[in-house]
């Protein structure tokens, strides 16, 4: 009888252990996603605060200072206000398109964060086509803007949506050609492999030095994709009131601003990953683990250092993007399209041909 009870206890313990493993597996699946969403949310709030402080400094005025220490909670207060404001719907508009448009813009950008290697072994999904996934998903966001403009039943909103689609098409092609050049140099479309390919020679192994023209074209194209000044024609206040945002209010209006800053952040992250070595410390011939005299088995410490390096490089480009917005005037629509089709496209195509030729001769 004692043996029988012991066997029963072992079976019960085994089943409890299996259930704990299942629960742990579920937690392990959702924990990185929740951490990523929390980090993205905090980053967006930080970017909004940085933009207000930088713009205040450029315009020689005082920025937000009362809501929290140094005004850091001002963006949170504005978001809370928009959350409780009424969502107005145009009486003759298409309600379904009007409601779905902002969500498509935000969700399509959030998915792109899954292929960003923030640090050593810290990437949500290491896909073999990581950079192309970002390009494919980023081309979906203008569809949401076009749906919003059409569903608003407003001529200014519709023109803003058309401008967003035209601008996206004009600058998506040069950006894709620049990414192809980077992929040829790294022999991979995976973001993790692209970062590893730049880590062999430290600072001088960055793709910035191997692709200077591609970097300039990519930087301009990414700013145009984010619809930031001097490329914010889809929402030009003097011409289109607020573009595709004209009829929106409440949380739906706030989603467009969230999408704008999410897009700016992901573009800066891809500049860091593709051209500035990602999470590498960038000291020639010295890796992070060797520099701190630790082994890669101490993954948490290495990952934290990698995340810090990645974000430091990313916020440098965020600062440049914000400073550009508050110092340069807006282009006309013809100037914007001419820049994309007549200048950036030939330069990026020539850069791709040169990269392909150099790779063929090096075989």
Curated annotation (Swiss-Prot):
Disulfide bonds: none annotated. Its EC number is 7.1.1.-. InterPro entries: NADH_UbQ_OxRdtase_su1/FPO, NADH_UbQ_OxRdtase_su1_CS. One of its GO terms (biological process) is photosynthesis, light reaction. The chain crosses the membrane at residues 26-46, 104-124, 129-149, 253-273, 300-320, 336-356. Pfam families: NADHdh. It comes from Glycine max (Soybean). GO terms for molecular function: oxidoreductase activity, acting on NAD(P)H, quinone or similar compound as acceptor; quinone binding. NDH shuttles electrons from NAD(P)H:plastoquinone, via FMN and iron-sulfur (Fe-S) centers, to quinones in the photosynthetic chain and possibly in a chloroplast respiratory chain. The immediate electron acceptor for the enzyme in this species is believed to be plastoquinone. Couples the redox reaction to proton translocation, and thus conserves the redox energy in a proton gradient. This is NAD(P)H-quinone oxidoreductase subunit 1, chloroplastic. Its main location: plastid. It comes from the Eukaryota. It is a multi-pass membrane protein. NDH is composed of at least 16 different subunits, 5 of which are encoded in the nucleus. Belongs to the complex I subunit 1 family. GO terms for cellular component: chloroplast thylakoid membrane. Keywords: Chloroplast, Membrane, NAD, NADP, Plastid, Plastoquinone, Quinone, Thylakoid, Translocase, Transmembrane, Transmembrane helix. The keyword Ligase does not apply. The lineage of its organism: Eukaryota, Viridiplantae, Streptophyta, Embryophyta, Tracheophyta. It is found in: Plastid, Chloroplast thylakoid membrane. It catalyses: a plastoquinone + NADH + (n+1) H(+)(in) = a plastoquinol + NAD(+) + n H(+)(out); a plastoquinone + NADPH + (n+1) H(+)(in) = a plastoquinol + NADP(+) + n H(+)(out). The keyword NADP applies.
